[in-house]
């Protein structure tokens, strides 16, 4: 997600105008491309490095590295699903609005986290509720 200047809303411009939506569409598509390229590099790297080491220490090190790479790729797969979901919300007109309250998420939050589905307030409420639930479970 490099190389994108923050969107500057023009005076009188509606929230989630066509220009604004196109700005976020381009950010999301670029982010998706970067992630897909990284996945391809990892697969290639793992194929190249998949040697059968006779030394158990070398084999253990390689398995540990592969495990870390696979966990990273799993997180990236989840992020790709969020990106695809955000792109779908751009298409259906719900992008930029809180999934819980329907209020504007806000440009600053979307610039920081283009896949955000909740306003800052809704996210804080959710995190507080989760913390309280965990605290209750720890008793």
PLM features: residue spans?
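Cys/His-coordinated zinc-binding microdomains
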Residues: 28, 102, 123
